[in-house]
Design a protein with these regions (language model features):
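Conserved N-terminal catalytic core of the sugar/cofactor nucleotidyltransferase
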Residues: 1-5, 13, 19, 26-115, ...
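A structural signal for short hydrophobic beta-strand segments in well-ordered beta-sheet cores
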Residues: 25, 142-145, 196, 208
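Glycine-rich phosphate-binding loop at the start of an alpha helix
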Residues: 35, 86, 90, 280, ...
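Catalytic-core segments of class I nucleotidyltransferases/pyrophosphorylases
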Residues: 100-101, 108, 114-121, 134-137, ...
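A short, conserved acidic/glycine-rich loop-to-beta-strand motif
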Residues: 123-133
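Glycine-rich hexapeptide-repeat left-handed beta-helix
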Residues: 287, 293-378
């Protein structure tokens, strides 16, 4: 079975992390998010994946230099201009004349993909959509269905309290070639807002399957941190990261590292290879990337430090992300979903709450912050 993963968006809501690393390659508990998706697809019988690329495509080819991940064969479809979700699917499936699975490149889920395919077959569907239930659907597209799962409407971002259902499009599809044929080539088209709604106006067989499987969109700082917490708490099953071993209940480590005898580490947590934890440091519900440092007296609470990141003496990171090679200076505090990009620095004694901190560079950074996403979904 073949699959397409949509990984071309710019990930604007996770800037400045995504200035240097595409969102699907950001780590979730010390493993690239996309690797977790590919592992899930392979587990359900997918043997070939087309990565639909737009933003920073070279990063993906560098990450998978031999075009393989385990037993999966990877192919790359690089757009020269944004084509939207449906346009990207059409472009990525050139030369494919069989059923494909499609998933968004920012969704972590335990969906039983085999069950979705069986649902699709049982109903003789042209397209089947995975639906997940949320408490407040006002930020999503909701999909009311008949009892057998036949889709009756698409309602985009309904006002609070008036949504016809709380079941939303969860971003995983099974599509037959007839659906791909409905998408015009080389045009910017949204499958959620154009292709699927248009199918309801024509003779078609469009269905949706509800599931209570774990599901999260990692596209905001809050959800990115939530995904780390959930993986640490074994929502995916098994160890939280490749090669991890349990040092004490809920505290995992990788490789060789140094933890001072006076340091305090509270589960759930994972410390990467080469990490250093100093005297009097405290780590609670957090992840340390490879080669990262939490210095003497520093506190890391419900936060993530990417590879080579550093908290200097008595620094604090609370509900925040310290990017690759970034530094929280001595006595400084990063809190309330502060995001520090690769190589960024928070000066000694400084305070940052809900901030976006990028490595110092020319004024282009401020211009980039104001530029909206184009084409691919974020």
């Amino acid at each position: 079975m073949k699959a397409v993963v949509l990984v071309g968006g710019e990930g604007t809501r996770l800037r400045p992390l995504t200035y240097s690393t595409p969102k699907p390659l950001l780590p979730i508990v010390n493993q690239a998010f996309l690797e977790r998706q590919l592992t899930w697809l392979a587990h359900h019988g997918v043997d070939e994946v087309v990565l639909s690329l737009g933003y920073l495509p070279d990063a993906f080819e560098s990450h998978f230099p031999d075009g393989r991940f385990g037993d999966l064969t990877l192919r790359y479809a690089v757009e020269d201009h944004p084509l939207g979700t449906a346009g990207a699917i059409r472009f990525a499936t050139r030369g494919i004349d069989e059923r494909v699975v499609v998933c968004n490149g920012d969704v972590l889920t335990t969906l039983d993909l085999d069950a979705l395919v069986a649902f699709h077959d049982d109903r003789g569907a042209e397209a089947s959509i995975h639906l997940t239930q949320v408490e407040d659907p006002s930020a999503f597209g909701v999909v009311p269905t008949r009892d057998d799962g036949e889709v009756v409407a698409f309602v985009e971002k309904p006002p609070k309290g008036v949504a016809p259902t709380n079941w939303i499009n969860a971003g995983t599809y099974v599509l037959e070639p007839s659906v791909l044929d409905r998408i015009p080539e080389r045009l910017t088209v949204s499958i959620e807002r154009e292709t699927f709604p248009r199918m309801l106006e024509e003779p078609s067989r469009l269905y949706a399957m509800t599931s209570d499987a774990y599901w999260i969109d990692i596209g905001t700082p809050e959800k990115y941190l939530d995904a780390h917490r959930d993986v640490l708490q074994a929502v995916l099953g098994g160890p939280p990261a490749p090669g991890a071993r349990e040092l004490s209940p809920g505290v995992w480590v990788q490789g060789d590292l140094h933890i001072d005898a006076d340091a305090r580490i509270e589960a759930p947590a994972l410390l990467g290879d080469g990490a250093v934890v100093g005297a009097g440091a405290r780590i609670v519900g957090s992840v340390l990337g490879a080669g990262s440092v939490v210095s003497d007296g520093a506190r890391l609470l419900r936060s993530v430090v990417h590879a080579g990141g550093r908290l200097d003496v008595d620094a604090e990171a609370i509900d925040s992300v310290v990017g690759e090679g970034a530094t929280v200076g001595a006595g400084a505090i990063a809190s309330d979903h502060t995001i520090m990009g690769a190589g960024a620095e928070l000066a000694a004694g400084a305070r940052a709450s809900g901030a976006r901190i990028r490595r110092a560079q020319p004024d282009q950074a401020q211009q980039d912050e104001k530029r909206p996403d184009e084409g691919h979904e974020d």
